[in-house]
């Protein structure tokens, strides 16, 4: 049963950090959590080609600080910062409240080490009608060249237009899902093809964050 747990939630507080940083009263918690989800969906829709790997949100009083980690910051910033200004204006119009938004753009120097971007690459290839095995092999080659220690990819659905849906997976290197000190990056996305939706899961092993020796006090 251990491998069925979400690999990021399993490691929260150990090798993974929360993606929303704030405290709220119990009565407001649900509303703010839904607002965080809406902000992320809005930004990913607006910046669909910007190579967004992660969106972190912090709240301080009436201010919402959004950090966007992207492989293509130029597409977001635009000329003279006009892109960020337009994003802030759109956010204020979309979420008509008294909160003030602030956006920080963080550049990712090696996008092939991000499971989110690898999954999106596979989805784009599948939507372009590339054979799923070739798309998986190309993704593994990109991640391996970037220096990842292990990667596992699973694609499920009507593969290559087959009548019966199935799942196929491939792995390169080590992906120790049961080791808590293992730095596992996980992502899931969907590819919308003419035959239906294909689900794509990517696990990446980036090494161990702690020494393998037990620490005793």
UniProtKB/Swiss-Prot annotation:
Keywords: Chloroplast, Plastid, Ribonucleoprotein, Ribosomal protein, RNA-binding, rRNA-binding
Keyword RNA-binding: yes
Top-level taxon of the source organism: Eukaryota
Xref: Pfam families: KH_2, Ribosomal_S3_C
Annotated compartments: Plastid, Chloroplast
One cellular-component annotation, GO: cytosolic small ribosomal subunit
Main localization, broad class: plastid
MF terms (GO), sorted A to Z: rRNA binding; structural constituent of ribosome
InterPro entries: KH_dom-like_a/b, KH_dom_type_2, KH_sf_prok-type, Ribosomal_S3_C_sf, Ribosomal_uS3_bac-typ, Ribosomal_uS3_C, Ribosomal_uS3_CS
Domain KH type-2: 39-109
GO biological process, one term: translation
Family stated for the protein in its record: Belongs to the universal ribosomal protein uS3 family.
Subunit details: Part of the 30S ribosomal subunit.
PANTHER family, sorted: 30S/40S RIBOSOMAL PROTEIN S3 (PTHR11760), SMALL RIBOSOMAL SUBUNIT PROTEIN US3C (PTHR11760:SF19)
Identification of the protein by name: Small ribosomal subunit protein uS3c
Taxonomic source organism: Chlorokybus atmophyticus
